[in-house]
């Protein structure tokens, strides 16, 4: 029986929060935080229908990130002193010209803002820099001039926008398509150009990746989103375009499922589960 109670290889939130018990090694906390993030990303499409689960996960993520020592002090200092420089963290992103994308100029421009106070109640160091939420925005230029016939927007969106949704669910970041050609209807884009809120339509086609996450993980997630998007948008020969073939198969599967759903069934009723919601969120400039 003693073996059941003396095993310290599992992370215990109660043990970590107790001042009387030595917390688990940082590597266990890091692994646990990774698992929490994975759960959070799976829950992302259902946050509106499961708000309590989402809130509890967020609380636990902030608590665990607050226990991880010596992480994010640079972000904490910038938050505290309100650095005006948009390039405060020059080492945030590597130069994406090394990715083999000729003409792809990744601009590591970032905007940093912090929320120095949280409404969540958890037992952790209140001044821990890892507990602060940091907002970063990364802009990636799309090389439309070098590849004028390549459908960058359609490739990023994927069937029913699913490719873009998966990027967001995997990384916890939000991705926006901006600039000329970001609106599907050219006539609508011409009408909107110059209006307030659509100034980006005068710019070259580009992508904005937005991360609003704890300081200890925001850079990792932003890099992850950048790598996925660059791989997704890398122009390749059609005969070797595995991503396009995969998207076409997914579209065919979705269309066949729609045909089955539209066919009258014996019960005449569909599922009322909120998880079957097909709500769409616009990702382009419209």
From Swiss-Prot:
GO terms for cellular component: nucleus. The modification Phosphoserine is found at residues 263, 273. Pfam families: KH-I_KHDC4-BBP (PF22675), STAR_dimer (PF16544). This is KH domain-containing protein At2g38610. Residues 141-208 form the KH domain. Transmembrane segments: none annotated. It is found in: Nucleus.
